[in-house]
UniProtKB/Swiss-Prot annotation:
Residues 41-72, 345-366, 428-453 have a biased composition (Low complexity). The modification Phosphoserine is found at S259. GO terms for biological process: chromatin organization; epigenetic regulation of gene expression. In testis, detected in male germ cells inside the seminiferous tubules, especially in spermatogonia and round spermatids (at protein level). In the ovary, expressed in primordial follicles and oocytes but not the external follicle cells (at protein level). Residues 1-16, 97-107 have a biased composition (Basic and acidic residues). This is EZH inhibitory protein. Residues 1-72, 97-462, 483-503 are annotated as: Disordered. It is found in: Nucleus; Cytoplasm. Changing R407E: No effect on H3K27me3 levels. The keyword Nucleus applies. The gene is EZHIP. One of its GO terms (cellular component) is cytosol. The keyword Phosphoprotein applies.
């Protein structure tokens, strides 16, 4: 089990070995670290690597790297965590602070303090708390190889933490140019990318790249979700402006998804804020789904920088209503023009259908109305004639009765064949089809036309009287029997003119 004294001996031995060849490069790399000409040519960068011993302790072996590793101004501490099995990577970054005048060493290398309790030392990045002025630096001078804790601005927190706690490097002070407080702990490839290049801009770069990727994922996911959720109004809005509006919209669809990926860092925000108004101005008008869809990519950068968001919103408010009104008009015009063919076709078809129905109903009512009209005219003619001469109505009625019979308005076939009396019976039945109440009122009008009461078959309209049937079927039989001469004359006069129109 390695103790702290063994580690200090090993570090002293290896530092004395590799100190001569590294002085010039490290002095060139970090000569201006603490302000005004405070350059120590004997400072060196040590890479501290720890291997977890089986008993649970961490054996730290400090070795000075070659010229390529010495040229870099940062090193990494890899500590394997036995509980999770994953290595905890901490960036040991040498920072340049031009505003610190009280630093007495050009290099600030964070060492790993191993607690005595046998547990592992976990070194990771410190979360951004409010104590930006505390900075714990362990420096190494060329003549003195033992470690000395030195506070740079104020009195630092004690370095010895309880067993199992972590020592975290402090973030950049707010006065440094690339300072951006990040609430995300640096882990994985971001710290290795931080360790590749010197300078404080890497912290801001990595801390910007991480919420940028997260916001990019949310942007693409929200855009795809909005596009998948509301395809109807979007399609309607796309087809509402035919011609140049569709490729214009297609070119603005791609920067909404590609601009977060193409432009990194603050340039991405500056570039994303430029197509924001145009995209939102050209897309927000035609439909509420597209307006809601474009409000998500605009509101995502608005959380990061509220001033460009408000400026963009103020910039949007000017072309927004005009475009909205104009495209709403064009959309309403297109919707009216697109719906008027449908409604026009629908109304035209309904008009044609209603015209056909009304024509049929008119023709049907005309077909029924002429029958009842002719029947009423016939009845009126017969009642108006009122003469005992039966020849006049019998000769005038058969052609009209033939037309009624061709329309098949008689309810039963005996009306077609039994000629003398069903003439009057057909008239009354056809008029009773058109208006049922008119036949009983007109039936007394038939009484002057028929001289004898036997021919009044209107009392039973559905079934003619058997006497009238006998008269119609067997005139010869009734000719043998004694019949009054006026009845015989009427039978002959009604039977003979009605037979020619028989089909």
């Amino acid at each position: 089990m390695a103790t702290q004294s063994d580690m200090e001996k090993e570090q002293k031995h290896q530092q004395d070995e590799g100190q001569g060849g590294l002085n010039n490069e490290t002095a060139l790399a970090s000569g201006d670290a603490c302000g005004t000409g405070n350059q120590d040519p004997a400072a060196s960068v040590t890479t501290v690597s720890s291997q977890a011993s089986p008993s649970g302790g961490a054996a730290l072996s400090s070795s000075t790297a070659g010229s390529s590793a010495a040229a870099a101004t940062s090193a990494a501490i890899f500590i394997t965590d036995e509980a999770s099995g994953l290595p905890i990577i901490a960036a040991v970054l040498t920072e340049r602070h031009s505003d610190r005048q009280d630093c007495r060493s050009p290099h600030e290398v964070f060492g790993c303090v191993v607690p005595e309790g046998g547990s592992q030392a976990a070194v990771g990045p410190q979360k951004a708390t409010g104590h930006a002025d505390e900075h714990l630096a362990q420096t190494k001078s060329p003549g003195n190889s033992r470690r000395r804790k030195q506070p740079c601005r104020n009195q630092a927190a004690p370095a010895q933490k309880p067993p199992g706690r972590r020592l975290f490097p402090e973030p950049l002070p707010p006065s440094s140019p690339g300072f951006r407080p990040s609430s995300y702990p640096c882990s994985g490839a971001s710290t290795s990318s931080q360790a590749t290049q010197p300078g404080p801009a890497l912290l801001s770069h990595a801390s910007e790249a991480r919420p940028a990727t997260r916001s990019r994922i949310t942007l693409v996911a929200s855009a795809l979700r909005r596009r998948a959720s509301g395809p109807g109004p979007v399609i309607r809005g796309c087809t509402a402006q035919p011609g140049p509006a569709f490729p214009h919209r297609a070119t603005h669809l791609d920067p909404a998804r590609l601009s977060p990926e193409s432009a990194p860092g603050p340039a991405r925000r500056g570039r994303a804020s430029v197509p924001g108004p145009a995209r939102r101005g050209c897309d927000s008008a035609p439909g509420p789904a597209r307006r809601g869809r474009d409000s998500a990519p605009v509101s995502a950068p608005r959380g990061r920088d509220s001033a460009p968001g408000s400026a963009r919103r103020g910039r949007d408010s000017a072309p927004g209503p005009a475009l909205r009104v104009r495209t709403a008009r064009s959309d309403a015009g297109h919707r009216s023009t697109s719906t008027t063919p449908g409604t026009g076709l629908r109304s035209r078809s309904t008009q044609q259908r209603s015209a056909l129905l009304s024509r049929r109903s008119l023709s049907g009512s005309a077909d029924e109305n002429p029958s009842c009209g002719t029947g009423s005219e016939r009845l009126a003619f017969q009642s108006r004639s009122g003469s005992p001469d039966p020849e006049v109505p019998s000769r005038a009625s058969p052609p009209v009765w033939h037309a009624v019979r061709m329309r098949a308005s008689s309810p039963s076939p005996p009306g077609r064949f039994f000629l003398p009396i069903p003439q009057q019976w057909d008239e009354s039945s056809s008029s009773s089809y058109a208006s049922n109440s008119s036949s009983p009122s007109r039936s007394p009008g038939l009484s002057p036309s028929s001289p004898s009461p036997e021919f009044l078959g209107l009392r039973s309209i559905s079934t003619p009287s058997p006497e009238s049937l006998r008269y119609a079927l067997m005139p010869e039989f009734y000719a043998l029997s004694p019949v009054p001469p006026e009845e015989q004359a009427e039978i002959e006069s009604t039977a003979h003119p009605a037979t020619p129109p028989e089909p």
